[in-house]
Amino acid sequence: MSSLSNQQVDLQLEELPGWQRDGNAIVKTYHFSDFVEAMSFMNQAAFHAEALEHHPEWSNAYNVVEVRLTTGDTGGITSHDVRLAKRMEHIVQPKCL
C-alpha cells in the first residue's frame, strides 16, 4: 500500500466534512451532546477500525472526541485512513452537534 498523493487526499477531503489534513494525517474533532454519546461513537468506531485492521489515534474529553488517522507503514495518508473516516462519518451523522 502506498500513500495517496496530495491531490488524491484533497479530493477525498471534499467528501469528508470537517476533516482536515495535518501533516501526514487527516484529523477531525467531533462534539457530542454528552459523554455517553461520545463514548457510543468511539465504541462503534472501534468495531469498524478492528474490521478494517486500521486503528485511529484518538482522545476523549467529556463530549469531545479528537481523531487522527494516518498509516504508519507508509508515513502518510492512505485509502485505509479515508475508508475509516468515511465509516466514522456514517456513524456520527445523526449524533454530532
From Swiss-Prot:
One Pfam family per UniProt: Pterin_4a
Alphabetized GO MF terms: 4-alpha-hydroxytetrahydrobiopterin dehydratase activity
InterPro entries: PCD_sf, Pterin_deHydtase
Entry keywords, A to Z: Lyase
Top-level taxon of origin: Bacteria
The keyword Cell membrane appears for this protein: no
The protein's enzyme class: lyase
Reactions that this protein is recorded to catalyse: (4aS,6R)-4a-hydroxy-L-erythro-5,6,7,8-tetrahydrobiopterin = (6R)-L-erythro-6,7-dihydrobiopterin + H2O
Record-level GO BP terms: tetrahydrobiopterin biosynthetic process
Record family assignment: Belongs to the pterin-4-alpha-carbinolamine dehydratase family.
Protein name: Putative pterin-4-alpha-carbinolamine dehydratase
Organism: Psychrobacter arcticus (strain DSM 17307 / VKM B-2377 / 273-4)
